[in-house]
Swiss-Prot record:
Species per Swiss-Prot/TrEMBL record: Pyrobaculum calidifontis (strain DSM 21063 / JCM 11548 / VA1)
Annotated Mg(2+) 4 binding sites: 25, 68
Protein name, per record: Thiamine-monophosphate kinase
InterPro entries per record: PurM-like_C_sf, PurM-like_N, PurM-like_N_sf, ThiL-like
Outcome following mutation: residue 136 to M: 7-fold decrease in affinity for ATP. 1.5-fold increase in activity
Gene responsible for this protein: thiL
Length: 293
């Protein structure tokens, strides 16, 4: 670890440093000889929600990896999973969720590993075919499009015990995420990311060498009304959610934006900043070893 200045660095800063050391492009997937490879994982002590079963937790980790592959226009085919658990009963429940997710997403579950430990940890590897190489650096003049369903998970984190239709939509999305959204025309897309650590994280990650100006909040009316009725900051709700597993695509301005997608931001020349309502966006999403920013 020589040369790594770890003080004050979070998960994303560490990974950026590591990829630089390895000479690998910073992205959410790896491209190797026409293949796409993705690894993703989580520990229950930091990532399992109180309303998730162990099977839900297994499913969630498959969905997280699948979302990163799908947003890159790649076709995931094979799945391997490593599970750590304190007992075989818990491990079996997690594996059941992994199996159910593999069937739902049409993945061949071909193997994995099992370990004993105090925490429950799930690591998923997906391998598939890469149709094209899609990075996450948009160009000036592009517009950002997404499916306007942000905010539900934010409300679920805060109000899951309260219930209600709006909150329940977020709870269900967090228990068994299903990132099977349609893809826009590939020839129109210049960059892509999915929102797992919050929309703010996506925007700051894409704003490298360019500025991003948010024009509209990509959230449904019922989410905005729910937040307003309770005096919540709608920016916090929309930008600092997480685990939406919704796609954000940078597309050429001359391409049509068709349902279920909406245009919500513009890419302009700049120095890597994100703007909302004339001010620099203060929300940066989630990162391990830092928390919400």
């Amino acid at each position: 670890m020589s040369g790594f200045g770890g003080r004050g660095v979070d998960e994303k800063g560490f990974l950026r440093w590591l990829l630089g050391e390895l000479g690998v492009e910073e992205d959410d997937v790896a491209y190797v000889d026409g293949l796409v490879v993705k690894v993703d994982g989580a520990a229950a002590s930091t990532s399992r929600l109180p309303f998730q079963t162990w099977a839900d937790f297994g499913w969630r980790n498959v969905a997280a990896a699948y979302s990163d592959v799908r947003v890159k226009f790649a076709e995931a085919r094979l799945l391997l999973a490593s599970v750590t658990a304190p007992d075989l009963g818990t491990a079996a429940e997690v594996v059941q969720g992994v199996r159910e997710a593999s069937q739902f997403f049409s993945l061949a579950y071909v193997g994995g590993d099992l370990n004993e430990g105090r925490d429950v940890v799930v690591d998923v590897v997906l391998v598939g075919w890469a149709r094209a190489r899609v990075g996450r650096a948009p160009r000036p003049g592009d517009v950002l499009v997404t499916i306007p369903q942000f905010g539900y998970t934010s409300l679920a984190y805060r109000f899951w015990q309260m219930g209600g239709a709006v909150v329940e939509r977020g709870v269900e999305a967090l228990k068994r995420p299903k990132p099977l959204w349609p893809l826009p025309p590939a020839e129109c897309v210049t960059a892509a990311m999915d929102s797992s650590d919050g929309l703010g994280d996506v925007l700051w990650s894409m704003a490298r060498g360019v500025d991003i100006v948010v024009k509209e909040l990509p959230a449904p009316r019922e989410v905005l009304e729910f937040a307003a009725e309770r005096g919540l900051d709608v920016g916090e709700i929309v930008f600092n959610g997480g685990e939406e597993f919704l796609p954000v695509f940078a597309v050429r301005r001359d391409c049509p934006v068709e349902s279920p997608y909406v245009s919500f931001a513009e890419v302009v020349p700049g120095e890597g900043r994100v703007w909302w309502r004339g001010e620099e966006l203060k929300w940066r999403g989630w990162a391990y070893f830092r928390g919400w920013g």
